[in-house]
């Protein structure tokens, strides 16, 4: 079957097939090479891109902005105070207006339904920059980083440590299953992934041959791992749960002891950032004062170690987002994948 990207939205990882995701990862590597060599790639010349942000961001905003400019497009940032999604104006009406003015729309916010409505009613490609359920553009950056380090994806083992119910755990479990990557969720039972997410991932794993594991046993989780991945213990909007999460997730911290348990000297560490690995922020100092914790989901030792690839990963947000925008909006000759 012929598969084309033009005009399509990217709202969740399951929107694209395995072959399409692999194509986008390889296309990202190509665009990264062009960028490094200073070769222009203005595939979106004259296009206007709306960047809608209900949730604040450093990497997603910077990546979409620089990617759009590199592609020759004009990005327009609309923050939480600039848009009325569901407040004074329905998401449907907002989508219809923005679709008349912009060629593509990025949305970063809380509700998956909102990004779906934007895609349904705008008439232009919509890209999910993060919702409470999924983080698809992050996945392309993550698996590009993994492929850069190992030269392949299929058969590798990635372990996610921490809150197994958040959007990162959802996305890693499903995307890994699609791509044939073995995914293990190392989490307390109280925070195991939702059953519907697990069932979805298992359905993809049957096709790809990926092996999935959800466990609270450290030895079982990390043995032979190629990638250890973690994220913040408290997601945006859940700040009231801080004390509970610190107590619950302390045993799931990524530290050198956990890395050594993996028994793989070529292991890499990933984090989607921001990371609470020290107290060099106002937030970090506040956490230390309230809970007596100087390091949270990852120790400073690991974060600054030779295993760490989180800044390569952050850079790759730009290259992978560029690939998605170019493929879905650039009228490129991609007849099938």
From Swiss-Prot:
Is Transferase tagged as a keyword? yes
Question: What is the gene name?
Answer: arcB
Protein purpose = Reversibly catalyzes the transfer of the carbamoyl group from carbamoyl phosphate (CP) to the N(epsilon) atom of ornithine (ORN) to produce L-citrulline.
Q: Which UniProt keywords apply?
A: Arginine metabolism, Cytoplasm, Transferase
Question: Under what name is this protein listed?
Answer: Ornithine carbamoyltransferase, catabolic
- Coiled coil ranges (UniProt) are none
Classification from the root reads: Bacteria, Bacillati, Bacillota, Bacilli, Lactobacillales
Pathway assigned in UniProt: Amino-acid degradation; L-arginine degradation via ADI pathway; carbamoyl phosphate from L-arginine: step 2/2
Can you say where in the cell this protein is located? Cytoplasm
Q: Quote the EC number.
A: 2.1.3.3
Q: Family assignment?
A: Belongs to the aspartate/ornithine carbamoyltransferase superfamily. OTCase family.
Identify the residues that bind carbamoyl phosphate: 57-60, 84, 108, 135-138, 272-273, 317
* Catalytic reactions of this protein: carbamoyl phosphate + L-ornithine = L-citrulline + phosphate + H(+)
Do the record's keywords include Magnesium?
Answer: no
Q: Where does L-ornithine bind?
A: 167, 231, 235-236
Q: Which Gene Ontology molecular-function terms are recorded?
A: amino acid binding; ornithine carbamoyltransferase activity
């Amino acid at each position: 079957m012929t598969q084309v990207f033009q005009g399509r939205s990217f709202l969740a990882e399951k929107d694209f097939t395995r072959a399409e995701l692999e194509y986008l990862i390889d296309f990202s590597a190509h665009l990264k090479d062009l960028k490094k060599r200073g070769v222009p790639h203005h595939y979106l010349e004259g296009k206007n891109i709306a960047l809608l942000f209900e949730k604040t961001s450093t990497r997603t905003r910077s990546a979409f902005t620089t990617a759009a400019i590199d592609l020759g497009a004009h990005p327009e940032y609309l923050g939480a105070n600039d848009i009325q999604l569901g407040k004074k104006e329905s998401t449907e009406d907002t989508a219809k207006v923005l679709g008349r003015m912009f060629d593509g729309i990025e949305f970063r916010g809380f509700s998956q339904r909102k990004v779906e409505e934007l895609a349904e009613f705008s008439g232009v490609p919509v890209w999910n920059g993060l919702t409470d359920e999924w983080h698809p553009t992050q996945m392309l950056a993550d698996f590009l980083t993994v492929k850069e380090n190992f030269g392949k994806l299929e058969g590798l083992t990635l372990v996610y440590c921490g809150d197994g119910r958040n959007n990162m755990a959802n996305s890693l479990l499903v995307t890994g299953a699609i791509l044939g990557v073995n995914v293990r969720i190392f989490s307390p039972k109280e925070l195991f992934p939702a059953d519907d997410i697990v069932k979805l991932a298992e359905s993809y794993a049957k096709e790809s041959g990926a092996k999935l594991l959800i466990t609270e046993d450290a030895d079982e989780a990390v043995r032979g791992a190629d990638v250890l991945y973690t994220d913040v213990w408290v997601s945006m909007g859940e700040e009231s749960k801080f004390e509970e999460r610190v107590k619950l997730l302390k045993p799931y911290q990524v530290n050198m002891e956990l890395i050594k348990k993996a028994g793989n000297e070529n292991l890499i560490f990933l984090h989607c950032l921001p990371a609470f690995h020290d107290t060099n922020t106002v937030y970090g100092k506040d956490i230390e004062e309230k809970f007596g914790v100087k390091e949270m989901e990852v120790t400073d030792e690991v974060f600054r170690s030779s295993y760490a690839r989180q800044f390569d990963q952050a850079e790759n947000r730009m290259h992978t987002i560029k690939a998605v925008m170019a493929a879905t909006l650039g009228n490129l000759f991609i007849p099938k994948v």
